[in-house]
Every structure is written in structure tokens, then in C-alpha cells.
Amino acid sequence: MSEPKQAKRYIVSGSVQGVGFRYFTQNAAERLHLSGYAKNLPDGRVEVYAIGTPEQLAKLRSALERGPWGASVSEVREEQAAIDPNYANGFVITY
């Protein structure tokens, strides 16, 4: 029996815009079979919303903490979120 899905929202701080962070996140999420989105925030942080099993989400968080080459992640804040059916199929970059 598979684990039930849940949703999490991550706010990633540091040097995370202009370094391919959203594309890195999309690639990691797709490899983990997660759905959701990544978007730049006006204050320089990146918001990531993901739906998956606790194990998949933990692996995504590890990837977010590393970031792509050229990024410098100083903090990843995590919070539970409601599952939004609008983002239940596939992982997208939003603007």
C-alpha cells in the first residue's frame, strides 16, 4: 500500500534567483514524480509548492537545500499546505 499524499510549501532564501533554481527544482520534482510549482517571489526568494508522499517531499527538500551550481541557499522554510487540485498533475514553473 502506498503512502498517502500531502502538500508542502517551501520558501527558499539566499542567492536563488537568476541561477536556474526553478528549473533545477522542476527537474528534481519530475525525477521524484512530484506535482506542484516553483516561482520567484518579488523579495528574491523562491516559493516551491509540491504534492507527494512524505518520502518524496523529504528528498525534494534535500535537493532544495543543495540547489543548483551557482546558487547559495541560506534557508529552506517548510510548512504543511492543503492539496490544490490545480497543481495535482505535473510540476510547472509559474510567474
Identify the meaning behind each predicted range.
Residues 1-95:
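Intrinsically disordered, low-complexity, mixed-charge
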